[in-house]
Amino acid sequence: MHYSALHRYTSYMNNTPTLYLPAHVTRYVTMKSGDRLALTKTIRANHRFIASRATWGGRTVFCKQPQAGMTGADELTREVEGLVAFNQFARDVAIPFCVPRLLYHDDSLLVTTFVDGYQTSMYTVPPEFWVRSFVAMDRYFRQPVRRLPRWARPSRRGRYIWEDMEYGVRKTAEWAIYPGLLADCLAYLRRYATALEARPMHADFTDGNTMFDNKNYWVIDFESFRPDWPRWYDVVNFTYNRMITRPEVTDQMQLILSQTVKQLGESPTTAHEIRFSAIMRGLSFLIEGTTPGGKGHASTNWISEERRYRVVQSLRFLVSGGDLTKM
């Protein structure tokens, strides 16, 4: 391990950021429309957003505000676009979940209907819910003309995704992965980027963003929504992440992934598309686990040696052509 990389990692570990958990928030927020929103309870707060229960026009609503300097109009814009797209989805198709209704938004505030429920757990939600949801989303958001996702195109900075990933790993996580394995991962991303297909996608469709009100499931938090995520990303993000963080549910995750693929049908590029997203998630684990949460990502969990080992082993398996449903 290089001393400089170890020193950076040790410094981060010794200076873990404290989440911003205010004892109270501003009692009233003035909307650009001139209305006033009364904030009655902070539901959750981190370094990116403050989410509150509020009262507006005599009814209880949900309010989301970005933290100054961390998030801004682009994240709220994506959330608005996601809420609009998924509300239309819910109206057009019989799906196993509901979506909050967008009531108001500007560049510093988002208001939706309030979901009076509790966050679900993967241990309480049946696998069939996830399979039905992933299949329904894929079919509904399928595009009439195949197009490449943003990961297959240069960014606004003129870099491809594998160049960004190499930069991120070498900056803070170079010590966490063998140089040859990193090179193999980057080569895979370069080779198969054009095999990807774009889809509008929630991109964080997980138990952490699913609530239950004793009658219906509700999907929330659309800040990661984009119209050009790679197909399969949502199901890989859900299943692969849990294979790494909760290995005891690996069999269940592999069942969800395999059933989703079976119902949608495989194409000649399906295996590469799934592998591509899993490799991206593996490298992201290393980057997110060695940098403090901020504008680049929301994670605040530092990677343990056990988790790092699982990530590295999974990347070895994937670049050698392994099937994620059998990992």
Outline where the language-model segments fall.
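An alpha-helical support segment within catalytic cores of ATP-dependent transferases
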Residues: 17-36, 145-202, 321-326
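ATP-binding glycine-rich phosphate-binding loop
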Residues: 30-58
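ATP-binding glycine-rich loop module of kinase domains
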Residues: 47-78
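Conserved kinase catalytic-core helix
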Residues: 89, 118-155, 179, 183-184, ...
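Short beta-strand micro-motifs within the conserved protein kinase catalytic domain, predominantly
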Residues: 96-109
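Conserved short submotifs of the Hanks-type protein kinase catalytic core
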Residues: 107-119
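Catalytic activation segment of kinase domains across protein kinase-like and atypical kinase folds
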Residues: 208-236
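Active-site activation/catalytic loop segments of kinase-like enzymes and analogous catalytic loops
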Residues: 233-266, 279-301, 306-309
